[in-house]
Design a protein with these regions (language model features):
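Hydrophobic, regular-secondary-structure patches
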Residues: 1-48, 55, 90-91, 141-142, ...
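Structured loop/turn residues at beta-strand edges in well-structured enzyme cores
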Residues: 22-25, 148, 186
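Residue-level detector of beta-strand face positions
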Residues: 37, 101-105, 189
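Short loop/turn motifs enriched for small/polar and acidic residues
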Residues: 32, 116, 191
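Mid-to-C-terminal secondary-structure elements
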Residues: 50, 54-74, 78-183
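Peri-transmembrane interface segments
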Residues: 182-191
Length: 191
């Protein structure tokens, strides 16, 4: 077998392989951009930056207050667009104006705001959704030199599919791709 303690990383090919599984309904990459300084005109703040795929809105829905969520075209064309959380909007646009179509600076890059969201409950991948800016996952990978690696995947199976079977299909696919024993519960973790 393989040596114990060997490390491996999820990547975009894993996402594409799992997307093809018949039990999977929605799947999203999750790429952490960490805390970043952001600004709009004279208004500044430090907020969480997350990279998601458009399916994330189906997996962990947010209420869309203005504009829209990320879509497939944003991802395919790697558009520099973002969806901002409610508190980000309040801090960077204190006048309360509609920010859609306006630009915010994230580090040295500029992004066009396409939507404002607030949580419908539940959590969003280890960040406070109201203080988070979401951009296409591929852009987080590019901006921070992550190559094709993905921090996590979020996915849902079809409603009539037993959860354990969805997990088993995913585990087998990833284990085969990364030469991991299919029964290694520590190497591939589901929650």
């Amino acid at each position: 077998g393989m040596p114990t303690g060997r490390s491996w990383e999820l990547d975009w090919d894993d996402l594409e392989a799992l997307r093809k599984l018949p039990r999977i309904e929605y799947i999203s990459a999750i790429c952490w951009g960490n805390q970043r300084n952001m600004s709009h005109q004279d208004h500044k703040g430090e907020f969480g930056l997350m990279g998601y795929s458009p399916d994330m809105q189906q997996i962990a829905p947010q209420q869309i207050l203005m504009g829209r969520y990320l879509n497939e075209v944003d991802e395919l064309r790697q558009r520099k667009v973002c969806v901002i959380g409610l508190q980000v909007w309040r801090d960077l646009f204190p006048g309360g104006e509609d920010p859609t179509g306006k630009t915010i600076q994230i580090g040295s890059s500029y992004f066009t705001v396409v939507g404002v969201t607030k949580p419908l409950g539940g959590m969003m991948a280890f960040s406070d959704p109201e203080r988070t800016v979401v951009i296409p996952a591929l852009l987080v990978q590019q901006m921070y030199g992550l190559g094709r690696t993905i921090d996590m995947l979020a996915l849902t199976g079809y409603a009539d599919e037993p959860t354990q079977e969805v997990i088993q299909d995913c585990r087998q696919s990833i284990a085969a791709r990364h030469l991991i024993a299919p029964d290694d519960k520590k190497a591939i973790y589901f929650q």
